[in-house]
Amino acid sequence: MSKDKALDIVLSEFLELAKVPRPSHHEERVSEYLFQWAKRHGLAVEKDNMNEIIIDKPATPGCENVPRVIFQAHMDMVCVCEEGVTYDPMNDPIKVINDDVTLTADGTSLGADDGIGVAMCLYLLQDDTLRHGPIRAIFTTNEEDGMDSVSYKHLTLP
């Protein structure tokens, strides 16, 4: 896949993610978004009681014995807005401004930390041009305010 095509996919995934409200401690909608994304792409997916998501992509033929690679990104974002801006982080999407050089948000935080990490993981999970061993993507919750959902169970490889 060309670099431009890969960047287009990452940007597209990020812009879709920006439509889903995802403040810390309220990641239910973004968790469900990622769960359904995995189902649409035919990937194995699990959701735990903290709304964390684990998506597994099998190895490409001939790479089954290559060690698993794990990618991790957090779903939540810091939700702030400029004075005078009406913004409800529980319900409002991020209004992204794309000037073809940079991405910014219209009066609110952008959510690039770690939305771009989530988008990059989604790109890697859908790219069928690369040969790879098993891939696991872990999407955690509440990183911005305590990291109390993160558990080390994800680090245990089967």
Descriptions of predicted regions:
Residues 55, 145-147:
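Generic structural signal for helix capping and beta-alpha/helix-loop junctions
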Residues 28, 149-150:
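Conserved strand-to-helix beginnings and helix N-cap segments that scaffold or border functional pockets
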Residues 4, 151-152:
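Intrinsically disordered, low-complexity boundary segments flanking structured domains
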Residues 63-134, 139, 144, 151:
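Active-site metal-coordination/substrate-binding segment of hydrolases
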Residues 2-101:
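Acidic/His- and Gly-rich active-site-bordering loop/insert found
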Residues 21, 153-158:
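Conserved small/polar residues in nucleotide/adenosyl-binding loops
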